Amino acid sequence: MIKYLSVIYFLFSSILFSDTTIVALNQVHHSFGGLGNNRTTTSEIQFPNSSTDYSSITMRVNLECPTGGCDPWDRKAKISVYHIDQWIEIGRYVTPYGVECGWEIDVTDYRSLLQGAVILKSFIDTWVQPGWLVSIEFDFVEGQSEYPFTIVRNLWNYDRLVYGDPTIPVDISTIQEYLPNDTEEAYIRITTTGHGQGNTENAAEFSDKRHDILINGEVSHVHNFWRPDCEFNDCSPQNGTWQYDRAGFCPGDKVDAQNLSILDFSLPGNTVEFDYVLEDYFNQCSPNNPSCVNGVTCTSCAYNNTGHTEPFYYIGSQLIIHTTNKHSNADVYLSISDQDTSISSVDIYLENYVSVYGVSFKLDLSLLEIQGDGNLSFEDGVSGRAEESNWTVSTNAEGLIVALAQGTGEPIQPGEGILTRIQLNLENVSIVSGFLKIIDVEASGYFGSQLSFETGEPTIFELLRTNEELITPTKITLHNAYPNPFNPFTTISYD
């Protein structure tokens, strides 16, 4: 019997959690010219509803030549997904010089983004009509993952960060993020590639520079992203100068992101400050350099479309956090904590990765059944992180809740815990049951900037309002006991 049950369980598990391949794009033409601007394509892709039951996720990218041949030049390209009001890069590559190639990219760390209906964007920086035929597939391999729950937070993302020009100063923002208490592993995932040539030191494509990553004001990592192995590229032979080593990439290859651990520099439950500082560099060949002399300082002081182009960096990065429990990727996460039926109140839980300067939301009562002659209403919020930050939490009869810093009130710093407790007024209400959920959220950051948010699932809400009038019985009936041949008598004690 045990053997048969094991076989049934195995078959059932195989049906539920089998390997899955999702075809995202199938020979989609990326081009520019007479066919229009098709350098970017977006599609809605249906991924598995949950990705926690897969041990790994691999993205396979394949480039083919359309009729007339491939783009003869190497072009930067990336793949992104739209998640909670922002694009997140999940893979990058550089096309080969005029030949077909393909690559596999491990995207397991993006599992929280690759579930349900997702908008995917594929971009190739091509400027010619032949372009490329792009196919993208995702292979989900069933099994137990080392880290089934992963948070993804965007850090520095610049499509064109000009390098070495004092008239266009580099301004890479300092970023603060919060590490939840149940963090198991955390690292910066960064992808930097250099572009532009014919400049001082042939920057930024052919210049080996090292940049600093600072954690809490101290240098934690020296970012060495130079590719010294382009001549050994599997996508060979190609046309062009594919053998030459470059800053962060090789033509005809995927761009490998680097994972830089941070738990040696900050512990879970704390806010971390990140900085990315570029190595000092001055491009004497810039047309913005008044001291540049053609044929003396450099071959040419003017940028052109051939051998002298502006040096810049193409930067994409995220904070990857592996946790014991499921978390949101949004700036702000609001939910209703497990209800204590012994008290007539609702605790609102807040998890925020960034500082919050104001928040409003509504408690939706439409899914509640209220019995009695009265109405359910709310009192202003008390205690919790809001009170600790000298905030006021106001409510109205419709369930709207507004929490703001007042006077000397400070923003609520990144962290997790109870935001506030909302007391319920239950006069002439006997029973409240059903579902309670948070809707219509607005969250503000510094100077009123809009923060992204997610809310928890509707919470089962059951509350029995008892008082002496309600519990006094008006009629008592005693029925026969259910027949029991082993104990035909029933005794009911009464005090």
Which ranges hold each PLM region?
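Positively charged n-region of N-terminal signal peptides that target proteins for export
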Residues: 1-5
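A generic beta-sheet turn/junction motif
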Residues: 181, 352-354, 485-487
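Short loop/turn motifs at secondary-structure boundaries
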Residues: 470-495
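Generic structural detector for well-ordered beta-strands
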Residues: 46, 139, 176-178, 261, ...
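Aromatic/hydrophobic beta-strand junction motif of beta-rich domains
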Residues: 59-61, 190, 348-350, 490-495
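Extracellular/secretory-pathway and virion-surface proteins
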Residues: 19-328
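Hydrophobic h-region of N-terminal signal peptides that target proteins for export
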Residues: 6-18
